[in-house]
């Protein structure tokens, strides 16, 4: 593996892996570590090119991040885990569950999306404009190249067909804010496409784990316990 992940860990028991969103790092879950660690061994990872985890030389896309997660679990002797992913982290978790179902006990998808069309236009259009501009200057500026890669995740990934989600057999919770930047009908499509998935819409925007942690944590624990 071309990188070594930075991560924070707290608690004992069955592993619960937390995956942050685009441009974030493991500190996003500051309001989850303590309450969730009362029941689980909670591991929050900085994904490739985020936080203190280096960019490395491998491709910078959701499927590579899912491969990275597999290597992280193998390297830390984690045979199976609950996986909670937020935003792009939710997309990583979704792709990982499809590729390695035997490694996922329960799955939580928070603010995930199948493709760029799942994001409200008021959010997605500026992202796509920023992506085009960053690509224009990527060869001249390391900062522009980094921005192009990060924005590219939200323009080009994960491109999962909803029919594929029928292959996810583990218990799944799909959770989002009632004012999320992900379209409500898109979140519901994800939940409806996964057999037996639970859907929870709670007050808040895209960042409910950080902005409405008490309600979010309650929903997560009710699902996991």
What does each model-identified segment do?
Residues 192-207:
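Catalytic histidine neighborhood in serine/cysteine hydrolases
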Residues 8-52:
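Conserved HGGG/HGGXW glycine-rich cap/lid loop of the alpha/beta-hydrolase fold
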Residues 34, 43-84:
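Active-site loop/oxyanion-hole signature of alpha/beta-hydrolase fold enzymes
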Residues 91-99, 105-133:
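Flexible "cap/lid" loop of the alpha/beta hydrolase fold
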Residues 205-217:
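Catalytic histidine-centered segment of alpha/beta-hydrolase-like enzymes
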Residues 181-186:
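Conserved alpha/beta-hydrolase "acid-adjacent" motif
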Residues 137-163, 179:
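Hydrophobic, aromatic-rich cap/lid helix
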Residues 168, 174-176:
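Short beta-strand/loop motif that positions the catalytic acidic residue
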């Amino acid at each position: 593996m071309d990188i070594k992940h930075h991560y924070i860990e707290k608690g004992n028991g069955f592993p619960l892996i937390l995956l942050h969103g685009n441009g974030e790092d493991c500190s996003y879950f500051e309001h989850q570590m303590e309450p969730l660690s009362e029941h689980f061994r909670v591991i929050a990872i900085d994904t490739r090119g985020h936080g203190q985890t280096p960019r490395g030389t491998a491709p910078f896309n959701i499927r590579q991040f899912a491969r990275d997660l597999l290597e992280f679990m193998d390297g830390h002797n984690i045979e199976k885990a609950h996986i909670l992913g937020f935003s792009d982290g939710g997309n990583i978790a979704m792709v990982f569950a499809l590729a390695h179902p035997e490694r996922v006990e329960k799955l939580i998808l928070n603010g995930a999306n199948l493709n760029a069309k799942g994001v409200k236009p008021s959010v997605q259009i500026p992202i796509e404009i920023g992506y085009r501009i960053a690509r224009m200057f990527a060869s001249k500026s390391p900062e522009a190249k980094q921005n192009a890669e990060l924005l590219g995740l939200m323009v080009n990934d994960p491109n999962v067909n909803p029919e594929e989600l029928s292959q996810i057999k583990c218990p799944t919770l799909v959770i989002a804010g009632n004012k999320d930047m992900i379209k409500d009908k898109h979140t519901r499509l994800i939940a409806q496409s996964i057999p037996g998935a639970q859907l929870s819409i709670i007050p808040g925007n895209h960042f409910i784990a950080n902005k409405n942690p008490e309600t979010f944590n309650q929903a997560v624990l009710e699902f996991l316990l």
